[in-house]
Amino acid sequence: MPKMKTKSALKKRIKITGTGKIMREQAYRSHLSQNKTTKQKRQARKSVQMHSSDVKRFKALI
């Protein structure tokens, strides 16, 4: 059976660290930012680790 192709949409949105963790950007940043607090906007800049319940599913798509 041939290899599965990598999902391009996912490839653009995640980054795999050297230790194998999957990192993603946070949501709620693109628009309507005037209604959000400075703290919310600052914390949304950081990348976060993908939740453990999603990791297995996403690794199959990569």
From Swiss-Prot:
One of its GO terms (cellular component) is cytosolic large ribosomal subunit. GO terms for biological process: translation. Pfam families: Ribosomal_L35p. InterPro entries: Ribosomal_bL35, Ribosomal_bL35-like, Ribosomal_bL35_CS, Ribosomal_bL35_sf. Keywords: Ribonucleoprotein, Ribosomal protein. Residues 25-62 are annotated as: Disordered. It comes from the Bacteria. Residues 53-62 have a biased composition (Basic and acidic residues). GO terms for molecular function: structural constituent of ribosome. Belongs to the bacterial ribosomal protein bL35 family. This is Large ribosomal subunit protein bL35. It comes from Mycoplasmopsis fermentans. The lineage of its organism: Bacteria, Bacillati, Mycoplasmatota, Mycoplasmoidales, Metamycoplasmataceae. The gene is rpmI.
